[in-house]
Amino acid sequence: MNHMILEIFNNLNPYLITLVLLLITPKIVTLIFTKLSALTTPVFLLDFACYKPKQDSTQRALTRKMVVDKARKYGLTYSKETVDFMEKILERSGLGNETYFPEAAVVDEPTYPPTMQKAVEESQEVIFGVVEDLLAKTKVNAKDIGIVIVNCSLFNVVPSLSAMVVNKFKLRDDVKAYNVSGMGCSGGLRCIGLAKNLLEVHKNMLALVVSTENLTDNCYMGNNLSMIGTNCYFRVGGAAMLLTNRSSDLSQVKYQLIHSIDIQTASSDLSYSSINHQEDEDGFRGIAVNKDLIVSATEAI
């Protein structure tokens, strides 16, 4: 039988053999590439931590009533209509009755604008605090972290917030540090996607992702009702996550990250202009949200 097959093969036209090989080789290469692509490095969530101010923190919890009373008493630039509107939003916001505010907002007589130093202190207290909690929770050595990604949409300073993390925890010299800003509420999720992509390329590595916002530098003091939402919905807070692709962590991981899907709608003028960081007619800086946000968000989902 083998002899017959060999004889048939020897009698084939060499040009025909070449043609067949040319036809099937790309298909074989494509099949191999597809199989190899499917063998991406799995990425897992080792653990996470959410920030809560410690007893000695300068940050304080205020009730909704305290927030409104402060706005009436010390918000010299707020009109009665603005404070009444804030009170209605707070009642329907879904936030708990006690939420945390930075030192610049809880002092007896807040000053406007607050200093950059106070804003930096808020970010450092939140970021350093939540990272310390996460490292203690996971018993991870900071030197083992190979990737650091920090997200803060509205506060961008030099040195960057990610550089502050590297300096504070004395991370290693080859750590890959990224600072993400201006991405709004999707920034944290985009950072998770970035961490996943990096971990699929760099083997045996831990990625630290931190997401927060800064209130000290972004409290709106004007009377444009479309810009008052920041004061009502945003509070002091932050979250830190450790993602891993290390096989040694498999017995401790909580979840596997299967997919990270981003929908980019900035090419749409409607979406692009739905949220803006800008100054109002009186020069007060804040976040303006218009009615197109709901439409844009619905299309993205």
List the predicted regions and their residue ranges.
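Structural signature of cysteine-dependent C-C bond-forming condensing enzymes
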Residues: 1-4, 132-146, 171-176, 199-209, ...
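Terminal signal-anchor or tail-anchor transmembrane helices
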Residues: 1-40
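Hydrophobic alpha-helical cores of multi-pass transmembrane domains in eukaryotic membrane proteins
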Residues: 19-25, 153-154, 211, 234-236
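Solvent-exposed alpha-helices and their adjacent loops that cap or buttress functional pockets
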Residues: 36-37, 141, 170-172, 184, ...
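Hydrophobic pocket-lining "lid/loop/helix" segments that shape and contact the acyl-thioester
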Residues: 42-69, 76-87, 91-93, 97-104, ...
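Conserved catalytic cysteine-centered active-site region
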Residues: 93, 98-100, 121, 152-205, ...
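Short glycine-rich or small-residue beta-strand-to-loop segments that form or flank ligand, phosphate
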Residues: 145-153
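Structural beta-sheet core signal
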Residues: 150, 208-209, 242
